[in-house]
Amino acid sequence: MTNIRKTHPLMKIVNSSFIDLPAPSNISSWWNFGSLLGICLILQILTGLFLAMHYTSDTMTAFSSVTHICRDVNYGWLIRYLHANGASMFFICLFLHVGRGLYYGSYMFMETWNIGVILLFAVMATAFMGYVLPWGQMSFWGATVITNLLSAIPYIGTDLVEWIWGGFSVDKATLTRFFAFHFILPFIIAALAGVHLLFLHETGSNNPSGLSSDTDKIPFHPYYTIKDILGALVLILALSSLVLFSPDLLGDPDNYIPANPLNTPPHIKPEWYFLFAYAILRSIPNKLGGVLALVFSILILALMPFLHTSKQRSMMFRPISQCLFWLLVADLLILTWIGGQPVEHPFIIIGQLASILYFSLILIMMPLASLVENNLLKW
């Protein structure tokens, strides 16, 4: 008799995705982040669900309801901080996952990569709206500043902003709709992640060498299930340490002050995972130009397959490209630091130079380096 996992309509989908899936024998720990992102998403949906049971999306009671969750609900403080810091872990895994894709040329799987870029935008939108919900000072002013960027769109900008706000300022209507969208988006993300996986399994995984691994495949279970469990344990250890020892490390103290439209915080800044994009936005003195640079700083990922000029897929055997890749990583860290600094003298110019370097590396220097390396192969 054939095994039920190979015949049952539902079980055979699970089987072909997580059990009998042929996987390259040489994929490193950089390939763990897909499963970690899945774990993060499940954790966020579960903790978010329990938070939503006690949260009220009204301007008068939102801040108090979050306080109530932390003080009065059983383990409410734990659920709240798991959710807030879970978002940080989600973005750490996301950035490492995307970085892995860039380094090893995984973007050559066009469909998988493009769904991934859409996923990145969806997760960023979800995180932004989630940050507005506690209705603290940084929530309110962050929502005001970021939504206001849409007013830079010619002709329809102002109408668009007021339509999103549901009035003439960020108010009750804005908070209610942000809560609704923040609740629904993770489920859309889960569906997109399924499509992401579907497209990936059409081609099979890439591997560090960038060469075809069809001649050397191993079953996903038990090899990579065990490996993923180890990754999950490391993730849980890191998240638990953050939540239990310093839950407010990555948050902003201003968000413990209830939202006040009459009092602007001295430095309006988003959560740490948006700072690199925020620095690029601020480095351009023109409003529309800044918004375009902000969007393009992430949308540029969709251009990666077209900017690939190398004869080799992976950067494993390309030392010049490797140097430029790590320069890009350093540049993003500098942008993240600048995004959290006030707009004054050394920081403005550093931010502008880092922004120019960011686009130059991706659009000009890395494709040129690949061409140079192609010629070096002939020697």
Swiss-Prot record:
Bilayer topology: Multi-pass membrane protein
Essential cofactor(s): heme b
Chief site of localization: mitochondrion
Further information: Heme 1 (or BL or b562) is low-potential and absorbs at about 562 nm, and heme 2 (or BH or b566) is high-potential and absorbs at about 566 nm.
NADP as UniProt keyword: no
GO BP term, pick one: mitochondrial electron transport, ubiquinol to cytochrome c
Subunit structure: The cytochrome bc1 complex contains 11 subunits: 3 respiratory subunits (MT-CYB, CYC1 and UQCRFS1), 2 core proteins (UQCRC1 and UQCRC2) and 6 low-molecular weight proteins (UQCRH/QCR6, UQCRB/QCR7, UQCRQ/QCR8, UQCR10/QCR9, UQCR11/QCR10 and a cleavage product of UQCRFS1). This cytochrome bc1 complex then forms a dimer.
Record's keyword annotation contains Glycosyltransferase: no
Transmembrane segments: 33-53, 77-98, 113-133, 178-198, 226-246, 288-308, 320-340, 347-367
Protein location: Mitochondrion inner membrane
Pfam families for this protein: Cytochrom_B_C (PF00032), Cytochrome_B (PF00033)
Binding-site list for a ubiquinone: H201
Gene Ontology cellular-component terms listed: mitochondrial inner membrane; respiratory chain complex III
Function: Component of the ubiquinol-cytochrome c reductase complex (complex III or cytochrome b-c1 complex) that is part of the mitochondrial respiratory chain. The b-c1 complex mediates electron transfer from ubiquinol to cytochrome c. Contributes to the generation of a proton gradient across the mitochondrial membrane that is then used for ATP synthesis.
Alphabetical UniProt keywords: Electron transport, Heme, Iron, Membrane, Metal-binding, Mitochondrion, Mitochondrion inner membrane, Respiratory chain, Transmembrane, Transmembrane helix, Transport, Ubiquinone
Binding site for heme b b562: H83, H182
Family to which the UniProt record says this protein belongs: Belongs to the cytochrome b family.
Lineage, opening ranks: Eukaryota, Metazoa, Chordata, Craniata, Vertebrata
The record's free-text note on cofactor binding: Binds 2 heme b groups non-covalently.
Residues engaged in binding heme b b566: H97, H196
Gene Ontology MF term list: metal ion binding; ubiquinol-cytochrome-c reductase activity
Name the record gives this protein: Cytochrome b
